[in-house]
């Protein structure tokens, strides 16, 4: 089981849910985690300390010898090959299942055996939770499974405030009955002093552009830079007059991440697709390889401003 590299809580929760189903079927299962997953270190450490999950996690390259016709690769919370934790597995495992809640991109996993994409769903964790609910009475998530899935839903819905529907609350109720611990989830999301300062700094260096666009950057590589960028982008939407907020942040190596948010008036997914990413109309992101952060930031500003101008002109013509 694997998701996108630099996994977030939704990706991790969905992977844990799929692993739960695999164990219930008596199958050997592994979750591939990328080297860049500092944002979920706390919950990963908790799972690793539990003997019931021994040898569950592997790193990219650990399954280099796997090329079995009987193996099944389940991809969660992503479907674009180059952003996956270990894209080489796509070439060695013929049976591939995709479970995602993002709009289908042109760059898609080749020849999947099964595709389950539901863009109306709040999160991949919600989709996997629904599968668990109808999988059979013999499948019951553990407390850690349920908490991981619950945390994924909480993150992607911003505490059930964005994109949460009836099915979301049904899934959350099932997870609570299965032992999901909201207190533990809250503890997982607590920020230390350094993160709080970094978030304040990220907000302070943001730049406002005509049309309701804010663009900020985090040039230094931080252990939880992705989380800080997402929180900063979310926070800037509360500024009066802002319709779109985008943050560019440095990742490991020559990788640059982009976190985009909108109030709903603008479709940030369209902009992120231009950078090889995706998401939803009001929440999207991308990761760019081999490009300086300043270059990516400049291109983000150019594309976002052009999109806003075109969108406003189109709306003006329609109103006329």
Identify what each model region corresponds to:
Residues 1-7, 11-56, 60-71, 150, ...:
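Hydrophobic helix-and-loop "lid/oligomerization" segment in the mid-to-C-terminal part
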Residues 18-19, 90-93, 114-115, 171:
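Glycine-rich, phosphate-binding/catalytic loops in enzymes
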Residues 61-64, 84-88, 115-118, 138-140, ...:
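A generic local secondary-structure boundary/capping motif
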Residues 90-91, 145-147, 266-268:
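Short hydrophobic "helix-edge" motifs at membrane interfaces and signal-peptide entry regions
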């Amino acid at each position: 089981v694997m998701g996108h590299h630099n996994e977030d809580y939704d990706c991790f929760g969905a992977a844990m849910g799929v692993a739960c189903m695999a164990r219930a079927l008596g199958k050997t299962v592994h979750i591939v985690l990328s080297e860049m997953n500092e944002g979920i270190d706390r919950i990963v450490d908790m799972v690793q300390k539990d003997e019931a999950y021994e040898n569950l996690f592997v790193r990219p390259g650990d399954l280099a010898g796997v090329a079995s016709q009987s193996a099944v690769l389940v991809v969660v919370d992503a479907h674009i090959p180059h952003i996956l934790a270990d894209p080489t597995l796509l070439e060695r495992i013929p049976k591939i299942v995709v479970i995602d809640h993002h709009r289908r991109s042109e760059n898609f996993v080749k020849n999947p055996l099964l595709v389950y994409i539901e863009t109306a769903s709040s999160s991949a964790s919600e989709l996997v939770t629904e599968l668990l609910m109808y999988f059979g009475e013999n499948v019951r998530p553990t407390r850690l499974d349920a908490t991981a899935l619950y945390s994924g839903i909480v993150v992607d819905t911003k505490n059930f405030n964005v994109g949460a529907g009836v099915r979301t609350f049904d899934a959350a109720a099932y997870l609570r009955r299965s032992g999901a611990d909201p207190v533990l989830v809250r503890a997982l999301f607590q920020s230390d002093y350094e993160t709080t300062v970094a978030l304040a700094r990220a907000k302070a260096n943001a730049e406002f552009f005509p049309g309701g666009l804010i663009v900020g950057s985090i040039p230094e590589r931080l252990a939880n830079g992705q989380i800080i960028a997402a929180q900063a982008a979310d926070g800037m939407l509360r500024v009066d007059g802002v319709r779109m907020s985008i943050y560019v942040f440095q990742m490991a190596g020559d990788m640059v991440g982009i976190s985009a948010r909108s109030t709903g008036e603008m479709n940030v997914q369209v902009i992120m697709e231009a950078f090889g990413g995706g998401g939803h109309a009001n929440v999207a992101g991308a990761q760019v390889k081999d490009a300086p952060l300043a270059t990516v930031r400049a291109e983000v500003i150019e594309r976002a401003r052009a999109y806003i101008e075109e969108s406003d002109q189109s709306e003006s013509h329609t109103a006329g």
